[in-house]
Amino acid sequence: MLPSRRKAAQLPWEDGRARLLPGGLRRKCSIFHLFIAFLLLVFFSLLWLQLSCSGDMAQVTRGQGQETSGPPRACPPEPPPEHWEEDESWGPHRLAVLVPFRERFEELLVFVPHMHRFLSRKRIQHHIYVLNQVDHFRFNRAALINVGFLESSNSTDYIAMHDVDLLPLNEELDYGFPEAGPFHVASPELHPLYHYKTYVGGILLLSKQHYQLCNGMSNRFWGWGREDDEFYRRIKGAGLQLFRPSGITTGYQTFRHLHDPAWRKRDQKRIAAQKQEQFKVDREGGLNTVKYRVDSRTALSIGGAPCTVLNVMLDCDKTATPWCIFG
């Protein structure tokens, strides 16, 4: 990590018809020989398919159906070891990239390979966790990040809260361990859309210790927006210093923003009391109160980049937050 790249925030995410049988077949081959060859082909094809499916299913864990609330639970199995495990030049720290997600598959196909290459060039040990919300409630980015924190393995010691539609382009951006305090990679001076001083969204790095100190994020924010503003107040309330990049000269060209609002509109509705509640600090809820279950955990490779997809069912207290329901 280069100290010069961080500053404290100043305040007030052969032939196409290839032969099917070894050695080919003569034109005058008997029907009996053709039949035997066909049976052999079917047998070996089924054998290959069985072995292939067995290998894939070994990567999928299903049936984790019991509801989970808060952190008093053992961490899930480790992700597959990456190539840097025995290379000390990658450093001692390992990053869990937490990606809240719903239905943006075209963005995910770009994000995972890009981030894996970007972090690998910077020699950052990492694993990408895609937190796919599969329930019927409105999208809850903050609760998904809480789930990602709890479900990421013990081998990671810091997290990146990372939007799937925000890609870093400048190689000088620092994704190293944020020992001094939370590090806001997508600072207001660099983010292509959001420029207010208290903004901490897009991409934010925290040590797991500091995230616990904040009690994670509030689970009350259903729909798009405002959860980051509440988390900023949690950071300050925990007595943590927020840091941002310094010496980056690419301005608003520092990131590529994938989201197309004309194609995929955001859920920005404010229903009933949500209009007032969105500006309050949730002093009781957070990491310790998130309720969910993981329906499945799948190890994938997208464009050669490894990641883990968790299908997450969030739970909503409709009395406390009736705005979790569409309409």
Curated annotation (Swiss-Prot):
Pathway: Protein modification; protein glycosylation. CDD domains: b4GalT. Keywords: Glycoprotein, Glycosyltransferase, Golgi apparatus, Manganese, Membrane, Metal-binding, Signal-anchor, Transferase, Transmembrane, Transmembrane helix. Mn(2+) binds at D165, H257. It is a single-pass type II membrane protein. It is found in: Golgi apparatus, Golgi stack membrane. UDP-alpha-D-galactose binds at residues 100-104, 139-141, 164-165, 194, 224, 257-259, 266. GO terms for biological process: carbohydrate metabolic process; glycosaminoglycan biosynthetic process; negative regulation of fibroblast proliferation; protein N-linked glycosylation; proteoglycan metabolic process; supramolecular fiber organization. Pfam families: Glyco_transf_7C, Glyco_transf_7N. Required for the biosynthesis of the tetrasaccharide linkage region of proteoglycans, especially for small proteoglycans in skin fibroblasts. This is Beta-1,4-galactosyltransferase 7. It comes from Mus musculus. The lineage of its organism: Eukaryota, Metazoa, Chordata, Craniata, Vertebrata. The gene is B4galt7.
